[in-house]
Amino acid sequence: MSNAEHLANIMVERFISAVKNGVDLVPVVADSTSTAKIAPFIKEFPDRLVNVGIAEQSLVGCAAGLALGGKVAVTCNAAPFLISRANEQVKVDVCYNNTNVKLFGLNSGASYGPLASTHHSIDDIGVMRGFGNIQIFAPSSPNECRQIIDYAINYVGPVYIRLDGKELPEIHNDDYEFVPGQIDVLRKGGKIALVAMGSTVYEIVDAAVKLAEKGIEVTVVNVPSIRPCDTEALFNAIKDCKYVISVEEHNINGGVGSLVAEVIAEHGAPITLKRRGIADGGYALAGDRKSMRKHHGIDADSIVDLALSLN
């Protein structure tokens, strides 16, 4: 894994490319220009940014209005404030009305570390899964992120994209092709499957390498497309396994662990699922990310220990 990049930088890069290629794209921020790292876009297109100030409801309402006026509206602000403060506007203005708005949840999960639960977003995927019409994605690498954003810009309809707040390493080859709904099987083998989304995918990739060094092969599944999701492909990826470990920097309810649980239950499969994430009823530990992930059992070493206990 190498060539780490910050996903917000990639987001801005794709915005600039889209406008240069004729897309009538308008970013909307809520006093979040630094969070969105959007200075390069402003330099290129100083009259194409809308800043509503610290007013997340206005952020989403304004974006919906721009979309109804024919623009490709993209909101760029921190996921915890987008999800909690603008919940009704996302539900009604964007999702119910099926407007062409792309919602970027920046610094998702526990990216803000020591700023604690006011700034953590551990329920965003669960919230968005409760709304209709909207597509939901969680990129796990720079390559995948570029492709998801390009797809979202060209797709007509609501999209939510969960972006981590730290640099992510590249885990995909140059020939990787993202397809909406797809399941990305990174490694196949053994009686244990590791399944993750977004920023924890590199943790399960790392865990798989460490397990292989101990002579244990595992299946590694990346789920970048939460909705649409090819659930049959997801089941086929794990159906021959005895155990599945889901890993996410999200509440264990509503995210990728819930998605896997639903798939296993609907198929009546004799597979034991171990969900690892932020515990039901809990909050993410405030502090540096390494300590937080170890505390919640979602770092590579904790995943290795759990897999060894099951093997």
UniProtKB/Swiss-Prot annotation:
Its cofactor is thiamine diphosphate. It catalyses: apulose 4-phosphate + D-glyceraldehyde 3-phosphate = D-xylulose 5-phosphate + dihydroxyacetone phosphate. Pathway: Carbohydrate metabolism. Its EC number is 2.2.1.13. Pfam families: Transket_pyr, Transketolase_C. Keywords: Carbohydrate metabolism, Thiamine pyrophosphate, Transferase. One of its GO terms (molecular function) is transferase activity. Belongs to the transketolase family. PANTHER family: PYRUVATE DEHYDROGENASE E1 COMPONENT, TRANSKETOLASE-LIKE PYRIMIDINE-BINDING DOMAIN-CONTAINING PROTEIN. Probable heterodimer composed of AptA and AptB. Involved in catabolism of D-apiose. Catalyzes the transfer of the glycolaldehyde group from apulose-4-phosphate to D-glyceraldehyde 3-phosphate, generating dihydroxyacetone phosphate and D-xylulose-5-phosphate. This is Apulose-4-phosphate transketolase subunit B. The gene is aptB.
